Amino acid sequence: MNNVLITAEQRIVLLANGRASLENPDFDPAPVVKLFTPDGGATWLLTEIDPDDHDHAFGLCDLGLGEPEIGWVSLNELASLRGGLDRKSVV
């Protein structure tokens, strides 16, 4: 599962941010987690997890192509990424 990427403490904060975001559309939390590919240019700055679907996190997603965007990402998909050296790609 995606616990490999996010600690229990980070998950608590991300879920709390997700609940606060549902209650207040103007809620604008700071990033809680930075994930990146060590052998590539991709970076994810995550601010919240959907309290109804713990696999989806929200934040800034930059695949290293010069066009970062804000949106949702699957934590399970991030955990399954492999880099060019065939090792776990996101840390």
Question: PLM features: residue spans?
Answer:
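N-terminal domain-onset segments
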Residues: 1-40
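Acidic, aromatic-enriched beta-alpha/helix-loop junctions
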Residues: 46-83
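Short acidic/glycine-enriched loop/turn segments that link adjacent beta-strands
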Residues: 40-41, 53
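Conserved small/polar residues in nucleotide/adenosyl-binding loops
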Residues: 90-91
